[in-house]
Amino acid sequence: VRFLLGGYTADGGGAAEGIGVLLAGDPDDASAAGELSRRAATAVRADSPSWITWHPSLPVVYAALEHRGLVQAFRRIGDESFAPLGEPVAAGEAVCHVAVAPSGDTVIAACWGDGRLVRIRLDGEGRPVTAADLAAAEDPYALGGISATPPRPSRAHHVRFLPRNTVATTDLGFDLVRFWHGDGGQGSRDVVLPRGTGPRHSRWHPSGHLFVVTELSTELYALAPDPNGQWRVVGGVPLSPAALPGDAAAELAFSRDGRYVYAGLRGSNTLAVLEVRGDGAELRPVALVDAGVEGPRHHVVVRDTVLVAGQLSHEVVALALDERTGVPGRARRRVDAPSPTCVLPAS
């Protein structure tokens, strides 16, 4: 399988030179269980493309150029090469995530540095053309009279397009999961998580629940809409009773049958494994395993393999996954990769 690698370049204190290319076994094989290798040449040079994602129907990748505060589109011009498509679009300070609407006409960018959510319109070729901010978040705890000195900053971090023309975004600084309908012009309906949890990333589960991992409290929450369409928390557990103080949660991924959830923990450098039970709202911690890297920033599941990006150890490793128990084993393959932050299947 062929993958693209996002990473930090020199402007972000990293060693990458742009978007890289990773191979797991044969490029045309559906399994990622083979030898890992990395192409010496980058797919395209870019400044700290820390998050990358595909257009749903075009051969175009969008990158959050985090330390430049820009979103750039790249068109595929070969199996392992890309070229810029249009000019980069200004987003906001420390833009850290981008997601593309299923319709393919809109990108929404989340900016950790200043809390902005920016809606970027695309033309028919996938080229970014215009940008506009969505409504800014407000700290629900400050509005409720719980003050902080200095005031807590908004930290928009993740965007997820959901069924029924809904978008979910997280605000790590204000402990919010925000739900938007349509293009977001009518504002958001917000779910407030406990103060200091720090919602980071989300995943839509086949059961109809949105799972949200909290970076600061290292928990997993299940959210669902009520019959009136109002979202609410319906379940939640710590990622693991063995998580260490100071751990910071990172990415979420599912086993291919959706029965297990995998959450990265930076600090202890582990992956927490949780089982999804009942109607999807019941979550049970199963195991905490060695991620095989330092700084497990991102991971993806490909059949019976978990690929983990070690941002601080400058490598990607492959963990064998026991699909019966859902528990990954120790790293069986590894390859050097400069400051990797995102692993994206390339086809």
Language-model features: where?
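Short coil/turn segments that connect the beta-strands within blades of beta-propeller domains
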Residues: 1, 57-59, 103-105, 164-165, ...
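Loop/turn-rich, solvent-exposed surfaces of beta-rich toroidal or solenoidal domains
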Residues: 246-311
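Conserved beta-strand positions in repeat-built beta-propeller and related beta-rich domains
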Residues: 5-13, 63-67, 109-112, 162, ...
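Short loop/turn segments immediately following beta-strands, especially the blade-tip
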Residues: 22-33, 74-81, 120-131, 181-184, ...
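Asp-box/WD-like beta-propeller blade repeats and closely related beta-sheet repeat scaffolds
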Residues: 82-158
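Beta-rich catalytic cores
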Residues: 15, 48, 94, 155, ...
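Surface loop/turn motifs at the tips and blade-to-blade linkers of beta-strand repeat domains
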Residues: 41-47, 87-91, 148-151, 191-195, ...
